[in-house]
Amino acid sequence: MRQIFQNNYSALGNVTFRRRALERAKEYSSDTPRIKSGTADSISSPKSENYEQFKKANLPSKRQKEKSPLERGFRGVFYMLIILLLSSTLNAQSLQSYQQEAAQNNPELKASFNRYLSELESRPQVGSLPDPEVAFAYFISPIETRVGPQRARISVTQMFPWFGSLSEKRSVSEANAKAQFEQFQEQRNRIFYQMEMIWSDLFEVEQQIRIAEENLRIINTLLEVSLSRYENGLTSQVDVLRAQIEQEDLKTQIELLKDNRRLLKERFNEFRNVDESSEVIIPDNLSASMALKNKDELKSTIIQQNPNLNKLRYREEASKEMVSLADREGKPSFGIGFDYIATGERTDVTNLSDNGRDAFVARASFKIPLFRNKYNAKVQQAELNLNSVQQDIITLENKLETDLYTALRDRSDAQRRFNLYDTKQIQRVEQAINIMMESYSSDVSDFEEILRLQRKLLEYQLKRIQAKADLYMANSYINYLSGVNNITENELNY
């Protein structure tokens, strides 16, 4: 569970769909189906009314005290209030609220956001003129002139790059900052997607525990019935032993599922950056919210909004500016300067006009790039970087398109499997079990066949959960590729 989530789309596909496909491909190694961890939506519980009727028909009934209608009415109102209170509490925190909490507290996101802020600070650095140069010179041996000895010199010089160089540097810095923001956005969306994976895993584990416990209650009923029939000499001890074996298998699997649930909660809290024992309210349903779009619309949305693709586009923009900037750096730069020379008075001449007058000098300088190899290499380097980024954009677009088609295929497959188990297979097995139990009451049906059908029912219920999980995760992955959780700089709250 703590495997590092690689920052590329192929790795995401492996974590989600290939893992799901591998789990679906594995058959249960024994007759008793293994309960897997994953995701699910609201799954109906197995019907147990027939088991209760079967139990009443084969076991001595206990006399119960009849409750008055008034008492039953008060109890019903009380239970309804409890359910309403619990529902409001369970829905107090949704997945979105947990994700927003992670967006505020996750250290990885904070580090990425600080890198974005750091990149913003480079713009005023590269877009400024070079610092002016100030020089002071003192003549140890004064230079004698007609108006007096020159004793000191103060010089001020300001260099200027070629026209447009500073604006090019600012453009490069802005493009790099935007690319870093898209990188932050990609990490934010990736963390949200990982939380959705764990969120669905938590829900599925909870559903699996519920189904396993309901099946355990049914097995307990069958065990009581088989014991009663064995005590009355109507069946052999083998039926009792088989029921006990099924009972222990289910208990073991339930304990494993509870351990998995605890581990998933700890992993979920890592993203929130809270104590690992902090409570996580497991959802009572899953809804894969995604706008119904066709393949072409989804592809267009991904091309426009995917943060990784937008990051490369800003890198391309910066590379284009770098090509122009490298060319401008091969142009001359110039500077202007001003000198002040302090001059002393002559003492050997009287009535000298301008005696001791200070001198003022204006200067202009040029930096001529005569050695062209260095500047030509810079231009070539910038062009190669630009070509590299453009090829990366084409590669990523192709990968995103392939990932989208894979997700759409997995979504269709999950929907078909869910419909199969939800509307056909489970109902057929339940019908067969009901018939077998009625026959067993008449000492006609085989107890082992009842257990086998019960295992088959459990298997189909778990496969229905897995199909719903695959459907949810396929939609979540498409949303991740589409950048549905993208934000703008104005929406940041750090």
Listing of model-derived features with the role each one plays in the protein:
Residues 100-110, 117-131, 154-171, 182-189, ...:
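A glycine-/polar-enriched beta->alpha junction
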Residues 135-171, 282-292, 324, 337-374, ...:
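Small/polar, glycine/serine/threonine/aspartate-rich low-complexity segments that form flexible
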